[in-house]
Structures are given as structure tokens and as C-alpha cells.
Amino acid sequence: MIARFNYSSPLGKIGMQADEYGFTEVKFIDQSKENNLNPTYPPIKDAVKWLDDYFLGNVPLTYPQFHLNGTDFQQKVWQQLRQIPYGTSVTYGQLAQRLNSSPRAVGNAVGKNPILLFIPCHRILGQNGKLTGYSGGLERKKKLLAIENIKL
């Protein structure tokens, strides 16, 4: 079963999609399918609670289950992204060092992150803390960083 739900956030609608194993996609709605199905599906309910907490400025304590499809390298990058604590940021170069890879390869994998917010690619900055690309848009990235009190 595939469940889809649109969440209204302060930064716009967030489209979520989950299967029986967990979330397969979380994107801002201008990048996602517009369907409102199964809002009571347990993974969707868990995600809504997480998002409510997050947008209230609270550190979410539990995460919904994910069902990620990607290359081995992408999976490693996404796992590293999940290790970046709320309220902190790292550069592409720092993340690349952790993975013994190049910043460009890491950037490509970060750009393919299918689960925005929950896998916090918005916490990745360019060299010298410069604000760089985000599939949800740079204005949203700035606002997400501000929610977490991350200074640019």
C-alpha cells in the first residue's frame, strides 16, 4: 500500500509518501505529487507529529521509519546526514572527509536526498559556511536553519 499526505507547514506544503516499510519521499509540494490519501496511516501520523514538533522549534526525539532507495554511496551519505545534530551544520568538505570522498560526490548524493527535513540536508553548507543549493529552495533552507538557530 502507498500512502500519501500533504502537510501544511510554515514554509509551504510538504508532500509525504510512505509504503508499508516506511517513508519513500518527503518533498516540498512544488516538487511532489499532490495527493491527500490515508492521513491516518501510522507512518504519516508519526511524521505529522515530528513536523509539528520541528516547526514549533522543538527537537524531535523520534523519527519515522524510512524506506530509502539509492546507491550504496547515497545511503552512506544519507546516514551521515542523519548524524548531524539539530542546531549544527557541517560543510560538504567536512562530510566528504568523514566518508573519504570528494565534496562533489557528496554534493551529488545530498542533492538526491528523497526525505527532506527528516534527513537534514539543509544542515550542509558550502565552504566557509556559505549558503548553497537545496532542492526545497534557498529561502526555505535559510528559514530551516533559522528554526534551528544555525547562524550563517
Task: Explain the meaning of each model-derived region.
Residues G129-L152:
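…primarily DNA-binding HTH/wHTH and HhH modules…
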Residues P114:
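Ligand-binding loop in jelly-roll beta-barrel domains
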Residues G111:
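Residue-level detection of the helix-turn-helix DNA-binding "recognition helix"
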Residues M1-S101, K151-L152:
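Basic nucleic-acid-binding alpha-helical/helix-turn surface characteristic of O6-alkylguanine DNA
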Residues L117-Q127:
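Short Lys/Arg-enriched helix C-cap and helix-to-coil transition segments
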Residues L81, C121-H122, L144:
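Structural signal for hydrophobic
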